[in-house]
Amino acid sequence: MDKELSIKILTPTIDLLSSELKSAIYNLNQANIPALGAVNDFEHVQQLYDFCTYCYLAFKQEKLIAFVFVMDESSLYQSPNYQHFKLNYDSFLYIDRVAVSDLYQRKGIGAELYNHIYLKCIEANIPLCCEVNTLPRNEVSLNFHLKLNFKITEERPFGKKKVAMLIKE
């Protein structure tokens, strides 16, 4: 791991999300569109955060450079993609969104965050789930997930898009 990289794990039931972090998450999310869905405003960031079980944050020199929103099966999140996993698995961790700053993409930051999350899955003996756009095709994300040994379980329509449902056990 990069010595200058620090990873912080927030638990929404315990940790408040500061205005500064909401702003940083919002900006990082918006910079990663269309790979990520847009968030409307800071309140939308807060709503997504409140659905999370964990929020993984990566900092370099105290600047947020990546985040991952993670939910378990008890979340009240209504996303159809999340609900797909909720209907098919008793217990799991679900990655709703991951964003890495342009300057730090393809430098192992995403993999480092995923490894931290997957360790929780190993401890609990549960799968790690997510989806990736296949229409339009997000080749970078698909390759990233397949390299980390995620398996595509099916492809599903999602509005005008299509997504591949992925799982790592």
Identify the residue ranges that each predicted region occupies.
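Conserved beta-hairpin
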Residues: 54-72
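C-terminal "cap" of GNAT-fold acetyltransferases
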Residues: 155-169
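Conserved acyl-donor/pantetheine-binding loop and adjacent beta-alpha core of acyl/acetyltransferases
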Residues: 69-97
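Short amphipathic alpha-helix that is part of the acyltransferase structural core
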Residues: 2-43, 59-60, 64
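Conserved active-site alpha-helix within GNAT-family acetyltransferase domains
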Residues: 134-154
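Conserved acetyl-CoA-binding loop-helix of GNAT-fold acetyltransferases
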Residues: 100, 106-119, 147
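A short, internal acetyl-CoA/4′-phosphopantetheine-binding micro-motif in the GNAT/acyltransferase core
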Residues: 96-105, 134-135
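Conserved GNAT acetyl-CoA-binding A-motif
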Residues: 121-134
